[in-house]
Every structure is written in structure tokens, then in C-alpha cells.
Amino acid sequence: MNKKFYITTLGCPKNTADSMSMHHSLLEEGFTPATFAEESDFHFINTCTFIQSATEETIQTILSAAQVKKQNHQKLVVVGCFAERYPDNISSEIPEVDLFFGTGRYAQAGKILREKFPDLSPPKREFNDSLLEKLKLSSEIENYSKPYAYVKVSDGCNRGCSFCIIPSFRGKFRESPVEDILRDVDRAIRAGAKEICLVSQDTVYYGRNSEVLLDMVRKVAEIDSLEVLRLLYLYPDKKTEKLLRLMGETPKIAPYLESPLQHVSSKILKSMNRVGESSTFKDLFALAREVKPGLEIRTSFIIGYPGEEPGDVDQVLRFIEETRPEKVNLFSYSPQEGTKGAELKQTVSEKEKSRRINLIRDVHLAILEEIHESRIGQTYDAIVDSVENDQAVVRRFQDAPEMDEVVYVDDISLIPGMIGKIRIDSFYEYDMNGTWISK
């Protein structure tokens, strides 16, 4: 009895890593991955509820899957952040959901499914460690064909930011043993990944002290078959400075800093329960560019937080104009029930939030156009992500997969995973066109 599963993943790269853990658990219990959701017996939706728009996308995805379920006689399984946060709502308002569980049980997904649906589960198969590893590896090769992979180094968060609901359902910070991280990296590389992205809610908190964090990163970078190592979500504190210096000493680490600042006004940062100030953030960005030539920066800001005034927005504008981060993500603040921020008087209207975001975006787009102009004729180390519609989709090492710019190349002879040099020829608002000049 061949029972197939399919996993739809919403949200951030951390969810992608969790879906892989769930994928492996289902393989261990004898379930088979489906190529399409419509042909699966069990459709899993790994959800996101970080902000209101993510929650709305999750609900719409579940409702759409519920319609498909009726036609295909599937079981619909909702997992992750939304299931952890709103279990009562799922039970009472979405009866089409056959099973749901939260963020701490991804690695038990196969056993949970077998216990809940014993009559619909495949026969239990016994694997020795070697055979199981081969099965997981071959499944990754078949189902995760991109030349990059996400490896999670921890879960949960101890920061206590007043706008963030994640600790309430992800829990306190828990790090993965170095041995587990190295195993996951090795498996991803053997499955074809050329680039490894280390992800977590708070990567720099790993090990609680700088040396443990640096030692973990060094061990990953020392893996001979690894081509590119990318570090994601670096909280802007003193440990990040030490990590940046290691990046400068380690050629394999991508010239890329992702550090979500969320704001630069000291007043708003204090209300958000975050550390740092505009001057320390400027120093951090300057250090990153000093120790890693060619490095590009991705950051984010939450606009419209309670108490934010025009002067606070001006500080964000001045910061962007002075530091010129290449990639800026802007979020409209949405109060999350159960957070300290939601208890504050909401002083900024939705219309005003949109106006402020548009103002900041226009300023950054003007800067980005100048940055794009400076890229014309320049060459960059790059990796081929895919070939589709008679074009290759290429990504500079300065750009992270799935969230940053790509370069389109009219060369279908390129192969996903190929690493070489690309010349930038022209640009759009965000993405670029280029020529592959080295194979």
C-alpha cells in the first residue's frame, strides 16, 4: 500500500528546514513523497503567522487545499506556527483539517500520522541506518533539486522583542548539537547542494558565547565539498561583530550580511525591547564592508510601531541615505495578540503606515538605482539556480536564495549548481540581466 505525502511550505527559510525534518520523518515511517499536492494522500501545510499578512496567506492556503481535498479524498494536515497559535480556531472553524500539530513535533510527523490513521498508513518498514540514510539522500536529490539548502542551527528565541509572537509558540532558544548540524550539511551537499544557508530565529545566540558560535561556523566552512556558506539572521550585537571578522577571514562565507534592525530610533528600539542605536548600527555596517570587500547588506524595518512619530521615520530615512543598504525589507506593524506591543495604544493609522512605508521605499529605490548603475559592467561570483523559459536564473554570491535579486542570462547551456563569473549588463527595478563569462 503506497501512501504519498506532499508538503506545502509557507513563510521563511526556517520553515523550509522544518519541512525537510518532517519529510525525513515521513520517509522513516514508509510514506512516499508525491510530486504534486493533488496526487498525495496526505497534504501537509507548514504554516506561518509572523505578521497579519502571513496569517491571512496561511488561512487562504488552508481553505484552498480544503477544496482540493474534497475532490481527491485526501487528508489535510496543518502544522507549524499557525497550528501552535490557533488550535481552537482550527478545530471549530476549519473542520476540513483532519490533523494539526505545532512547531515542536516536525521530527515525529511520520509517527503521528501512523498513530492517527493506522488504517491508511503503509506497512511499517525496518531500515538499518545505512539504508535509511540512502533513502533520505535519494529523496532529497529527487525532491529538492535547487543548488542550495537550508540547515537549521537552533529553534526558539530568548530576545523578547515586544512586537514578536514567535517565542510564545517556538519557545525558548534551543540549539542543535554541532554534530547534527554537520550531518545535515553533509547530507545536503551529497544531495547536490553547492550552497548551505545556516538559519534560525537568532543565529548569533548560538552557544551563548562567541567562541562556540565561531567554532561551529568554522567547522561547517571546513567541509571540503562545500562551495558557499551563507549566514542568515544575524542579530545586531557584539557577537555579530566577531562573526563578521570570521567572515572576512573565510573565503567560503558569502559576502552578505542579513541583519534585521527593525528600527533605528532609540525611543522605538527601547519600546521594542531591542538593543542598539543608529550609531552602533552604522559601525556594524561599516565593519562588514571593511572586513569583507564586495559585501552587500540586507536589513528590515518595522514601520508604524506604537509611538512612532515623523521624527522617528526621518531617522530611518537618514540612516538609509547614509549607510545605503542594498536590500531593505519594510513591514507595516501589525499588533500580535499576546505581545507587549499589542498592549500599547496604536497611535499610527493604517493609511499613515502605508504613506511612511512608501516614502521610505521611494528613497531606497532611488539609492538602489544608483547601486544598479554602478554594477553595470562589473563581474561577480555567481551560482546558477535554475534554467527555465529559455533563460538561466543566476544569483550573485551577494544575493540570498528566494528573497534577493537574480540575474537573467540568455544561455540555456548553463546547468543548475554551476559556479562561475557573471557580468551585469542591465537592470530592472530589482533584478538584472547579465552574461555568463566563466564556466
UniProtKB/Swiss-Prot annotation:
Give any GO molecular function from the UniProt entry.
4 iron, 4 sulfur cluster binding
Residues engaged in binding [4Fe-4S] cluster 2: 157, 161, 164
Gene3D superfamilies, sorted: Methylthiotransferase, N-terminal domain (3.40.50.12160), Nucleic acid-binding proteins (2.40.50.140), tm_1862 like domain (3.80.30.20)
What enzyme class is recorded for this protein?
Answer: transferase
Q: Which residues form the TRAM domain?
A: 373-438
Where is this protein localized, as stated in its record? Cytoplasm
Q: What does the record give as EC number?
A: 2.8.4.4
Where the record annotates domain Radical SAM core, the positions are: 143-370
* Note on how the cofactor is bound: Binds 2 [4Fe-4S] clusters. One cluster is coordinated with 3 cysteines and an exchangeable S-adenosyl-L-methionine.
**Which terms in the GO cellular component ontology are assigned?**
cytosol
Q: Which domain of life is it from?
A: Bacteria
Annotated [4Fe-4S] cluster 1 binding lies at 12, 48, 81
Q: Tell me yes or no: is Cytoplasm among this UniProt entry's keywords.
A: yes
Record domain MTTase N-terminal: where? 3-118
Q: Which reaction does it catalyse?
A: L-aspartate(89)-[ribosomal protein uS12]-hydrogen + (sulfur carrier)-SH + AH2 + 2 S-adenosyl-L-methionine = 3-methylsulfanyl-L-aspartate(89)-[ribosomal protein uS12]-hydrogen + (sulfur carrier)-H + 5'-deoxyadenosine + L-methionine + A + S-adenosyl-L-homocysteine + 2 H(+)
Write down the Pfam families for this protein, in alphabetical order.
Radical_SAM (PF04055), TRAM_2 (PF18693), UPF0004 (PF00919)
Which one GO biological process term can you cite for this protein?
tRNA modification
Does the keyword field hold Transcription regulation? no
Family to which this protein belongs: Belongs to the methylthiotransferase family. RimO subfamily.
What is the role of this chain? Catalyzes the methylthiolation of an aspartic acid residue of ribosomal protein uS12.
Q: What is this protein called?
A: Ribosomal protein uS12 methylthiotransferase RimO
* Annotated organism of origin: Leptospira borgpetersenii serovar Hardjo-bovis (strain JB197)
Q: What is the lineage of its organism?
A: Bacteria, Pseudomonadati, Spirochaetota, Spirochaetia, Leptospirales
Q: Which gene encodes it?
A: rimO
